[in-house]
Amino acid sequence: MAEKTQKSVKIAPGAVVCVESEIRGDVTIGPRTVIHPKARIIAEAGPIVIGEGNLIEEQALIINAYPDNITPDTEDPEPKPMIIGTNNVFEVGCYSQAMKMGDNNVIESKAYVGRNVILTSGCIIGACCNLNTFEVIPENTVIYGADCLRRVQTERPQPQTLQLDFLMKILPNYHHLKKTMKGSSTPVKN
């Protein structure tokens, strides 16, 4: 079965995915996305589509799991895709089950985002914040502190372009990478 699940991982050219990361199920990874070693992406209840320019750090867990009240053995629920937009950052040790996420969001270290939360764009979920409500988080919302207080920032967070460029250069020097899809044919020099 491990053979079958590995084949459904699609990595776009230009993405940097370390071999030490764990990716299971039907996962599509967009270009310029960087996935650190020990990051986990698990698609068990449906596919996960990750857009362009995302940064997924060590021990981050992105999981499309079955809701607590459904077990895959008893019922055959229709698979629901998890869609992640562009330029999102999943910091060290965060846990995300959000089924829909826009662009330019940051989930900070040890933060938890539940399955029924929809992140729009430009949101920051602060370190150690636990967000497990049925709601759509408005654009540019910052959730912070031990009490998960909220405020709206005037601008959305800057994309991590320089950090992505740096990691795309450095990670291949120290880690083996997973192969990308053969999208473009490059001539081989003899």
Curated annotation (Swiss-Prot):
GO cellular component: centrosome; cytosol; dynactin complex; kinetochore
Name of the gene: DCTN6
UniProt xrefs under CDD domains: LbH_Dynactin_6
Domain of life of the organism encoding this protein: Eukaryota
GO molecular function, one term: dynein complex binding
Organism in which the protein naturally occurs: Homo sapiens
Phosphothreonine modifications at: 186
Principal subcellular localization: cytoplasm
Cysteine pairs bridged by disulfides in the record: none
Task performed by this protein: Part of the dynactin complex that activates the molecular motor dynein for ultra-processive transport along microtubules.
Tissue: Ubiquitous.
PANTHER family to which the protein is assigned, alphabetical: DYNACTIN 6 (PTHR13072), DYNACTIN SUBUNIT 6 (PTHR13072:SF0)
Gene Ontology biological-process annotations: mitotic spindle organization
Post-translational modification: Phosphorylation at Thr-186 by CDK1 during mitotic prometaphase creates a binding site for PLK1 that facilitates its recruitment to kinetochores.
UniProt protein name: Dynactin subunit 6
Keywords in alphabetical order: Centromere, Chromosome, Cytoplasm, Cytoskeleton, Kinetochore, Phosphoprotein
Subcellular location: Cytoplasm, Cytoskeleton; Chromosome, Centromere, Kinetochore
Subunit: Subunit of dynactin, a multiprotein complex part of a tripartite complex with dynein and a adapter, such as BICDL1, BICD2 or HOOK3. The dynactin complex is built around ACTR1A/ACTB filament and consists of an actin-related filament composed of a shoulder domain, a pointed end and a barbed end. Its length is defined by its flexible shoulder domain. The soulder is composed of 2 DCTN1 subunits, 4 DCTN2 and 2 DCTN3. The 4 DCNT2 (via N-terminus) bind the ACTR1A filament and act as molecular rulers to determine the length. The pointed end is important for binding dynein-dynactin cargo adapters.
Family: Belongs to the dynactin subunits 5/6 family. Dynactin subunit 6 subfamily.
